Amino acid sequence: MASNFNDIVKQGYVKIRSRKLGIFRRCWLVFKKASSKGPRRLEKFPDEKAAYFRNFHKVTELHNIKNITRLPRETKKHAVAIIFHDETSKTFACESELEAEEWCKHLCMECLGTRLNDISLGEPDLLAAGVQREQNERFNVYLMPTPNLDIYGECTMQITHENIYLWDIHNAKVKLVMWPLSSLRRYGRDSTWFTFESGRMCDTGEGLFTFQTREGEMIYQKVHSATLAIAEQHERLMLEMEQKARLQTSLTEPMTLSKSISLPRSAYWHHITRQNSVGEIYSLQGHGFGSSKMSRAQTFPSYAPEQSEEAQPPLSRSSSYGFSYSSSLIQ
């Protein structure tokens, strides 16, 4: 976790070919790694002063890259070429051979996942494709300070079919914290934020966690799909338990219930889960097969509220199953 994270990998004066005139012009080029502020990219400024004051500049996003290579000296001295999968390319020339090697090395490491020993020895890494794919499945986020955690800052988020993980930005193998999806009370997003509320069953306890990110919509959709799958699994389990209860009632045998899946007590789960509960299934034995609705707190006792609804955080429901935050929470 890095609270003072710097996304600049390399910067300096280079010469870039003008598309209109076809000549090389000197400019200040900044290479930034992926972060909560944006994807991997090259930012071109007229000079170093313009970069310092963040004046008008051109941005080239570095995704779908096919190869990064050095051009022959006969073509252009000290030149580096970035080749994309659509067969387009971006070429720039450095002021020295050492600078060109530095630019090429950093671009290969960040964009292609190439390690230093791969460049020097030329040995293929059979696990590189899998590692790169896993890295691509992580989202760059900035965890805002919260009283529930003693860490904050730049990190990466991974969403699996069961959990949300935060990983260290500098060491991708260091796991910082984990939240089970089934323990989330609610979640929401906008163009620059993703936020969720955790329940008591999480390691962090109850709390509101807010992440600054440019990928809020993608994170939301992935969390939404995973929680829908959990709800469908819970639905199938409840149906199996009902069928088992009906069969055992007809045979007048004691019923053995399997362990059910815990789900959050929230409006989101209210929409996508059944209202049947273990208590309702027991009622099938003595009161026929009619079902009676139970309150959400009775259905999921582990998530019984400790405070009134008026004391809950002021979260406004969205038109979907998530929610959007009022401006007072974001600030």
Curated annotation (Swiss-Prot):
Gene3D superfamilies: Pleckstrin-homology domain (PH domain)/Phosphotyrosine-binding domain (PTB). InterPro entries: Docking_Protein_DOK, DOK4/5/6_PH, IRS_PTB, PH-like_dom_sf, PH_domain. Residues 8-112 form the PH domain. Residues 316-331 have a biased composition (Low complexity). A motif (DKFBH motif) lies at residues 263-273. SUPFAM superfamilies: PH domain-like (SSF50729). On Ret activation, phosphorylated on one or more C-terminal tyrosine residues by an Src family kinase. Keywords: Phosphoprotein. Residues 132-237 form the IRS-type PTB domain. Residues 293-331 are annotated as: Disordered. Interacts via its PTB domain with phosphorylated RET. Belongs to the DOK family. Type B subfamily. PTB domain mediates receptor interaction. DOK proteins are enzymatically inert adaptor or scaffolding proteins. They provide a docking platform for the assembly of multimolecular signaling complexes. DOK6 promotes Ret-mediated neurite growth. May have a role in brain development and/or maintenance. This is Docking protein 6. The gene is Dok6.
